[in-house]
Amino acid sequence: ISCSLVGSEMCIRDSSKTLQGKCTTRPYYEISTSQFSDMKIRRLMRKYGFGGYSIYRYLVNEALHQGDYFLPWCEDTARKTASYWNTSLEDVTRIVKGCIQVGLFNGGLYRKYRVLTSEDIQQNYLKTCCMLSRLPDISEELELAVS
């Protein structure tokens, strides 16, 4: 059913969902020590500064913290993010669009399903599933080529 839902519908569906089928909350995830040399990160930082990078990392963390490989992007998620960082909804929305522009989140899946995901997020999700000896459950529609 989730393959036909857009992000806002997933927000509603997942707000009362238990962790059944998810890989549970991961206490940590990998961040490359060369991340600040990554052109995507550098372009994001150049345009939005440390605040943009912080919000990007927060959104990645939220997806993985929930034991998932994507974060549904809807008004509720945007408002929670803005509230957490004590910034405006407009700033958060602009930064998310910037993350998509530089390729930190997959633009096609964002436009089609209103979700934030990337190969890195999905790779971390797969590692979590392996670590917990659980089968990963990435829907075909949202799966990115993860090596």
Predicted ranges, named:
Residues 13, 17-39:
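Long, low-complexity, charged/polar intrinsically disordered regions in eukaryotic proteins
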Residues 33, 44-48, 117:
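Generic alpha-helical structural element
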Residues 43-50, 58, 63-111:
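Winged helix-turn-helix DNA-binding recognition segment
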Residues 112-119:
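Minor-groove-contacting beta-hairpin "wing" of winged helix-turn-helix DNA-binding domains
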